Regions:
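Mature catalytic core of soluble alpha/beta enzymes
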Residues: 2-6, 17-342
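Hydrophobic helical h-region of N-terminal Sec-dependent signal peptides
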Residues: 9-14
């Protein structure tokens, strides 16, 4: 097994709420669709009830942001990062515990305490000038990175080093989709599709009584090297679950004329790129799918099956770089059975 490393993906969860917009489902059944913008991304929520739950959706977004949004200076995670508090709420605690499970099963290749390194490279919630990254700065930050340096005492989060900071962006967007799904289920909804910035929580069927079908981006490079997205159609299971995608083939910065990927390896402190360019995960929850998609970006394709075996009910699709064709796809047998023909 390759040496395992702590890594986290940077993602933007800027505080910025937009109101829900309701659209009816016409003659296709008693379904409601809510759309809008939140956290500088879009959301789309469909469910089998002719009731407007937009206020409950907005309340869920606000509660999530107050707990886990590192861009919100009033959030709990911001206060903990500034050492102004040690107190968590149930949401922050749940996400942290799930992140620790993934960290342990990956041998530390997934780690939410990598925030200072992510910030150093300009991908995190503290904007930095990436041309100022030096070996000395990287070494100093690496000294206080590590999920095993965080301890819980009830609802208190205790850091071994006060310089430690956490960023749950690599898992919390999926968790937010789960929170909306939970809210709908508490109100009697049995079929829903909650999509937040590409992270999806799902259950049941659509308004035609069929399994939900979604599109997953598959990059294709033309002869000139231009990347075009092709949609792989995936028929989701009827049982509750989540789908999430992480990838590097579009998210990068240019530093001194070089493309820098947004996955940082704190073992070295520098960006990492394996042969995995994108990972799509289907899992029992969207939070788990989100975190595992991130973790897959730190591994070679050959290492991913062993990682996924630790998590029952998880399937994957990987986009790999290929010198001849530009990209190629690798899927688990379970994922492949869900892909619809072109």
């Amino acid at each position: 097994m390759h040496h395992l490393r702590h890594v986290v993906l940077a993602a933007a969860l800027l505080l910025g709420f937009g109101s829900c917009q309701k659209s009816g489902s016409g003659s296709e059944g008693d379904y409601t669709k809510l759309t809008g913008e939140v956290f500088t991304t879009t959301f789309s929520i469909q469910y089998n009830a002719q009731k407007d739950y937009s206020e409950a959706v907005d309340s869920t977004f606000h509660a999530f942001s107050h707990s886990l949004n590192p861009f919100d200076s009033t959030s709990l995670i911001s206060a903990i990062n500034r050492n102004e508090s040690q107190l968590m709420d149930s949401m922050l605690r749940e996400v942290f515990l799930q992140s620790v499970v993934i960290s342990r099963h990956t041998g530390g290749s997934y780690d939410v305490t990598c925030a200072p390194l992510i910030n150093l490279w300009g991908f995190g919630f503290e904007k930095k000038k990436t041309d100022s990254v030096t070996p000395e700065a990287i070494d100093s930050v690496r000294a206080f990175v590590g999920f095993d340096k965080i301890h819980l005492d009830g609802m208190r989060m205790i850091k071994e080093d006060p310089r430690m900071k956490m960023d749950f962006s690599s898992i919390s967007k999926g968790y937010c989709s789960d929170l909306v799904a939970r809210m709908l289920k508490r109100r009697g909804v049995t079929s829903y599709l909650v999509e937040l910035g590409g992270e999806i929580a799902f259950e049941g069927t659509n308004s035609r009584g069929e399994n939900w079908v979604i599109g997953v981006d598959k990059p294709i490079a033309d002869p000139a090297g231009v990347i075009n997205d092709f949609q792989v159609r995936v028929q989701l299971p009827r049982a509750a679950g989540g789908l999430a995608t992480s990838g590097n083939y579009r998210n990068f910065k240019v530093v001194n004329g070089k493309k820098i990927a947004h996955t940082i390896d704190p073992h070295t402190g520098y960006p990492i790129q394996t042969d995995v360019l994108s990972a799509t995960i289907i899992a029992p929850t969207c939070m788990l799918a989100d975190g595992l998609a991130t973790a897959c970006m730190t591994r070679t394709a050959a290492d991913v099956p062993a990682l996924i075996q630790n998590f029952p009910g998880v399937e994957y699709m990987l986009i790999l770089g290929d010198e001849k064709t530009g990209f190629r796809t690798v899927m688990s047998p379970g994922f492949e059975r869900l892909v619809l023909p072109d």
